[in-house]
Amino acid sequence: MAESPPTEVPEPPARPVLVVDFGAQYAQLIARRVREARVFSEVIPHTATIEEIKARQPRALVLSGGPSSVYEPGAPQLDPAVFDLGVPVFGICYGFQAMAQALGGTVAHTGTSEYGRTELKVLGGELHSGLPGVQPVWMSHGDAVTAAPDGFEVVASSPGAVVAAFENRARRLAGVQYHPEVMHTPHGQQVLSRFLHDFAGLGADWTAANIAGVLVEQVRAQIGDGHAICGLSGGVDSAVAAALVQRAIGDRLTCVFVDHGLLRAGERAQVQRDFVAATGANLVTVDAADTFLQALAGVTNPEGKRKIIGRQFIRAFEGAVRDVLGDKPVEFLVQGTLYPDVVESGGGSGTANIKSHHNVGGLPGDLKFTLVEPLRLLFKDEVRAVGRELGLPEEIVARQPFPGPGLGIRIVGEVTATRLDTLRRADSIAREELTAAGLDSLIWQCPVVLLGEVRSVGVQGDNRTYGHPIVLRPVTSEDAMTADWTRVPYEVLERISTRITNEVPEVNRVVLDITSKPPGTIEWE
């Protein structure tokens, strides 16, 4: 088995608030909400030992929800030694119950479950001080805390939970049965912020300016006097990563734009124009379309396509180093890997590999560069904020996400030149109509997918047709960890469908994907 490519992962920008994941659907969302309170956070699995937690020097702990019952055999447990660390702790849902149990409280199956919107009655305390006495919250529990631990004040209740929140200000401990991290709990962010800033005493120091400054210094320390090469995909992530590294090492960075033939219409010209104008960076374009298509010939498996694209991508870089940079030593490869990429590729301890990202799990084992991934701890909205802080224009930082493997993973089936041309035309029409309708700010991204191995019968011009379907996948999201389908007006969908079926040969059907994430991922492959 090939060894993993060398990666130097710098120290986190600050001592983190650790979100302990008990199997929650929303663990990443909790981490993001902590960051929205301008406090740095990371997620760790519940299997982390006390020694591992202590080594991270956390500023506070947040215990996530989870699907288990705390009293069932094999359920994730909370080591009571956590409370001997002297750090503030906040429990949410299952984490709230695990906290109560570990501290001597009582958790039971009361026979009264609460799922969805529930009214919370505030009884006092500091956690909900200044907020409405009765407020809507989002619940998801079958068990409940029936008695708080000694020394804790019960500060809220609900119809199904006599102890819906408790706190111990002296020990800087608190918890809630509901989910403050979801948008269905209107005052949830205020409660979480109150714990972080008032209970835990943490400053609001996780800002775009501070993030950019720290990351620039980290890159400078990692690369030293070396030279780096950065791959531009045309997307936000690689552009911000390149701008950060250029700020750190100046003209010792060379940016390479690999045209792998899997780009959308007009994308190559846009990258060459916008990025160079914004940064003045050294940019080399490599035309590798034929090489990529040859490597992808006959491949239909999504994981196989991603790994081939990742491998060919690196080979194109190595060729650029030889042909363009000559004898100048280039040791570092900059990539725009984000926190969700790392999580979905199994890069976080205790996480399952959902799919290989071309810039994480799709890299070859014999990689000849050391990776520099300055954005690997950031969510997308944080990347955009850092990009603005670095002076990148809105044309770059506000772009909708586009995967590095490009249209190669938006063709279900074999990637061919003909299918790419078909998909480009359909994608261009969809983007034109969504922009004309003023929907760009509403939609996180809209993958347009060609079902290359599927045909359906149609009628066009009184003739029977047997063409491919096109799938529209407009989604709304905040960080790509979860997503919902965007309610695009019917008249806009009608225009897109009419134009695609009239203007794109071989397409006779347009369908709309209305699946949320989870269970479906944003991209089809």
Curated annotation (Swiss-Prot):
**Cellular component GO terms held in the UniProt record:** cytosol
GO molecular function: any one?
GMP synthase activity
User: Pfam families in the record, alphabetically?
Assistant: GATase, GMP_synt_C, NAD_synthase
The pathway noted for it is: Purine metabolism; GMP biosynthesis; GMP from XMP (L-Gln route): step 1/1
Task: List the CDD domains.
Answer: GATase1_GMP_Synthase (cd01742), GMP_synthase_C (cd01997)
User: What residues form the catalytic site here?
Assistant: C93, H179, E181
Give every GMPS ATP-PPase domain span.
206-399
Q: What is its EC number?
A: 6.3.5.2
- Locate the Glutamine amidotransferase type-1 domain: which residues? 16-205
Record's keyword terms, sorted: ATP-binding, Glutamine amidotransferase, GMP biosynthesis, Ligase, Nucleotide-binding, Purine biosynthesis
Write down the chemical reaction(s) this protein catalyses.
XMP + L-glutamine + ATP + H2O = GMP + L-glutamate + AMP + diphosphate + 2 H(+)
Protein origin, superkingdom: Bacteria
Q: What does this protein do?
A: Catalyzes the synthesis of GMP from XMP.
Could you describe the subunit structure of this protein? Homodimer.
What HAMAP family does the database record attribute to this sequence?
GMP_synthase
Fetch the PANTHER family from UniProt: GMP SYNTHASE [GLUTAMINE-HYDROLYZING], GMP SYNTHASE-RELATED
Q: What is this protein called?
A: GMP synthase [glutamine-hydrolyzing]
Q: Where does this protein come from, organism-wise?
A: Mycolicibacterium paratuberculosis (strain ATCC BAA-968 / K-10) (Mycobacterium paratuberculosis)
